[in-house]
Amino acid sequence: DAGHQRKGNSAKEPIGPGASQTKPKVASGTHGNASGLNEYELTLQVSLKLRDELQARGYQVYMIRETHDVNISNAERAQMAANQGADILVRIHANGSDNTSVAGALTMAPSNSNPYLGKSVISASQTLSRKIVDCFCAATGAKNQGVMQTDTMSGINWSSIPVSIVEMGYMTNRTEDLNMASTSYQTKMVQGIANGIDAYYGA
């Protein structure tokens, strides 16, 4: 799932099945001041390369989006993946911070007390997230910020299959932003994510 889309959708949806708390269906995402890229552009660039790499490794890949002009909520993205019979959902994103010196990669997974997901999905999501962030940082040299456990992400809470949100780096950090926009670094990121998926499956 290449995170975001050209136009955000501020209409609200429950953060999980049966939840009273709501969030915008799709945030507009962050922006690279140095690269000039929008997050939705970067995530699709990387996701298309990741698709090709995973297919070359023998995986079947289902893309949530392959263009910018879509309107798919985070809950819908999670449900689409499961409805396609996917085994895992990998959500490609980039980070942002008010502090421009902050840099590094992290993944997001549900906590053990997530009220929307079963224990097996929670455990597998945490494992998938750990494998991806470790392999990603090994491939790229990015600072490893580890696995952030969160139960406020609609795109996690609506997933009936193991899921990880990959925050590849900070578009608000000049060096990391320019790295992520470069073809050579994108290749390293893709290799790292694919290596993490391989590691998850024990390949």
Regions found by a protein language model. Name each.
Residues 1-203:
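Catalytic-site microenvironment of enzymes
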